[in-house]
């Protein structure tokens, strides 16, 4: 019996009938899967079949908080999403911070399931137990920033707003659901929400999340704040942008659609220059003392007035991939992506893809329509982001999933750098092989987060030889399992270690919050979540063949830098993959075995 952390209530909203009901969430879901990503995957497994497509009325959007979401635990802001992705027509998980998750928990719900499809544009407001449907016709076409302004003026809700922009309305395959200035960034959930004619949701509450032992928890957090801040000092001063210089120097950066891994003359987009020339302050997520977001403003030039907080991945997408060395253009591109509601990472990679097609003479005059697609052209990047969001001209092609593009233009396929429809992150896997395995086996495509952030283990700590093969299966599995349980908790990975949430979990936070000491079981829960997601994938037709990387990664040697000459061949990759599958109790085709399913206690859970 839980005495805090959970409400054990699910809000199920049917858009087709403009109705809702509140359901109990079985306690067993929490005990075996914790919350967040794990419980969302369970509902997906039960309710979204393999035959359902992303834009089917039968597709659903499942939002789920974790036990620490909305609590005094540092960074307790995260909540998770599961749906069928328009990038692949397969399972996708995604997470966001912002205030919607914490406020949803305060309003009395651990999660929401959106089902059906509205016959007209709507938005939904949640005020504790009052759920209201509103006509959204007059706010269609508005940016996500404009939706926030509307919600504040009309409903007195500024924080706790979740919306899509024009990209979601136009079903861009990698459009986002924005949560204030944060987002469910990867996987195209914004397009699913747009297809359902749901423009926005907003929640407000004055209620706090119930805690098992609030006094002990607050004492622990007060004592821990120094360690939390001091453990990430450069995140406060420079944010994740600090990694741009590190990764570029090591020859592992995403450059020119992964043709190379070193960006020349890149100092103008390094964090030191960002801080010196553009930073105006820091922004923090709910209950976070680190405040890693670096708020930047362009003070002069054609992009004067642009304000955003570019992360490492966004800088990599537009700076590295598109070779844009004007940081002002990157700030503007980031702002526009947030406003239009599109994934900066996939957008940058798709524009880089177009730039390579242009480099190789594969785009005709009609497709180009006067666009200058030369590498480094920031003005063209800005133009294309709008064209993609509104599906105009070449933007309509680039708004599609890699699978759609490859089917329509087979000659373009070899230049699409993706796994399962999701583009690579800003890390070149030929520069550190574990990242390649992480991309290939990620539970949502080529993702460095869900797949495994191997940078610390392979590049900065010296724990593993980055070009080694043996041992990488276990390394990646451990990172993935850790991330799976952290995503199920409802906290951010940046501050997790200072609170004991590592691959060797410790501490009493979960007991203080829920009354149950989950800590010794966390890695097992993470592994259970990951294999559950793979069971979903297997049901949807994903096998070993889908875990392979693009040909460029496996056949072309890096031309320069500290990893010059490196290539991750199929034979090398297979060796890592075999080790990984064996440790997970998956068969040689990547399918979870009965032995593994039983060992992880998934057999009984999935009957319920």
At which residue positions do the language-model features occur?
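Protein-protein interaction/assembly regions in multi-subunit complexes
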Residues: 1-190, 195-211, 218-235, 239, ...
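Extended C-terminal regions of large enzymes
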Residues: 152-187, 193-608
């Amino acid at each position: 019996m839980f005495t805090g952390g959970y409400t054990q209530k699910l809000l199920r909203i049917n858009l087709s009938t403009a109705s809702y009901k509140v359901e109990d969430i079985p306690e067993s879901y929490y005990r075996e899967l914790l919350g967040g990503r794990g419980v969302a995957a369970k509902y997906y497994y039960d309710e979204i079949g393999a035959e359902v497509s992303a834009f089917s009325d039968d597709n659903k959007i499942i939002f789920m908080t974790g036990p620490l979401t909305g609590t005094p635990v540092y960074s307790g802001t995260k909540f998770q999403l599961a749906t069928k992705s328009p990038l692949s027509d397969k399972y996708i998980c995604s997470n966001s911070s912002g205030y919607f998750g914490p406020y949803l928990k305060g309003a009395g719900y651990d999660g929401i399931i959106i089902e059906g499809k509205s016959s007209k544009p709507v938005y939904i407001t949640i005020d504790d137990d009052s759920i209201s449907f509103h006509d959204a016709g007059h706010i269609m076409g508005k940016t996500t920033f404009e939706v926030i302004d509307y919600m504040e003026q009309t409903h007195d809700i500024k924080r706790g707003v979740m919306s899509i922009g024009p990209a979601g309305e136009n079903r861009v395959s990698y459009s986002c659901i924005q949560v204030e200035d944060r987002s469910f960034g990867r996987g195209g959930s914004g397009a699913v929400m747009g297809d359902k004619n749901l423009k926005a949701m907003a929640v407000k509450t004055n209620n706090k999340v119930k805690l098992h032992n609030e006094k002990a928890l607050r004492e622990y957090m007060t004592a821990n704040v120094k360690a939390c801040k001091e453990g990430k000092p450069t995140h406060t001063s420079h944010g994740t942008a600090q990694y741009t210089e590190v990764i570029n120097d090591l020859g592992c950066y995403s450059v020119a659609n992964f043709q190379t891994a070193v960006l020349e003359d890149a100092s103008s987009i390094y964090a030191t220059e960002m801080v010196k020339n553009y930073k105006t302050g820091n922004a923090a997520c709910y209950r976070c003392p680190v405040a890693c977001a670096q708020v930047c403003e362009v003070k002069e030039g054609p992009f004067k007035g642009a304000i955003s907080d570019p992360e490492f991945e966004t800088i990599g997408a537009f700076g590295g991939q598109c070779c844009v060395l004007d940081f002002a253009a990157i700030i503007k591109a980031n702002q526009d992506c947030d406003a239009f509601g599109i994934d900066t990472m996939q957008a940058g990679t798709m524009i880089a893809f177009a730039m390579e097609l242009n480099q190789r003479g594969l785009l005709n005059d009609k497709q180009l329509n006067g666009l200058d697609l030369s590498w480094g052209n920031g003005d063209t990047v800005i133009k294309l982001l709008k064209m993609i969001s509104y599906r105009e001209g070449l933007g309509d092609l680039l708004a599609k999933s890699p699978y759609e593009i490859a089917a329509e233009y087979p000659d373009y396929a070899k230049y699409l750098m993706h796994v399962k429809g999701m583009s690579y992150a800003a890390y070149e896997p030929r520069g550190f092989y574990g990242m390649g395995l992480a991309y290939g086996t990620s539970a949502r495509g080529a993702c460095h987060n869900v797949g495994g952030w191997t940078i610390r283990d392979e590049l900065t700590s010296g724990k593993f030889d980055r070009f080694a093969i043996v041992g990488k299966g276990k390394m990646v599995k451990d990172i993935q399992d850790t991330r799976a349980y952290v995503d199920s908790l409802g906290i951010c990975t940046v501050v997790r270690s200072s609170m004991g949430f590592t691959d060797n979990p410790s501490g009493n936070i979960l007991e203080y919050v829920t009354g149950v000491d989950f800590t010794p079981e966390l890695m097992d829960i993470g592994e259970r979540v990951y294999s559950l997601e793979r069971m979903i994938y297997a049901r949807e037709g994903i096998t070993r063949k889908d875990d392979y990387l693009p040909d460029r990664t496996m056949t072309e040697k890096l031309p320069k830098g500290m990893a010059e000459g490196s290539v991750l061949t199929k034979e090398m990759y297979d060796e890592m993959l075999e080790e990984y599958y064996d440790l997970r109790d998956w068969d040689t085709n990547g399918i979870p075995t009965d032995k593994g399913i039983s060992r992880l206690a998934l057999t009984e859970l999935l009957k319920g």
